[in-house]
Amino acid sequence: MKASELRALDDAQLRAKLSEYKVELFNLRFQKATGKLTNTARPKQVKKDIARILTILRERELAQAELG
């Protein structure tokens, strides 16, 4: 998911996406361990999406602290 798409979401939606991606990453790791992972690039994509979400949430926290 692109960062611009993620920035359009509010905090609650971002946190929901974050939990979805964490569950997906867990399942992908499990598939890799059992040898059933077909798309080997997907775990890297999911990790990057998680990092993007965490970055956006942190940016918003810092902006709020700066304002208030």
Swiss-Prot record:
Pfam families: Ribosomal_L29 (PF00831). GO terms for biological process: translation. Keywords: Ribonucleoprotein, Ribosomal protein. GO terms for molecular function: structural constituent of ribosome. GO terms for cellular component: cytosolic large ribosomal subunit. InterPro entries: Ribosomal_protein_uL29 (IPR050063), Ribosomal_uL29 (IPR001854), Ribosomal_uL29_sf (IPR036049). The keyword Glycosyltransferase does not apply. Belongs to the universal ribosomal protein uL29 family. PANTHER family: 60S RIBOSOMAL PROTEIN L35/50S RIBOSOMAL PROTEIN L29 (PTHR10916), LARGE RIBOSOMAL SUBUNIT PROTEIN UL29C (PTHR10916:SF0). NCBIfam families: L29 (TIGR00012). This is Large ribosomal subunit protein uL29. It comes from Chloroflexus aggregans (strain MD-66 / DSM 9485).
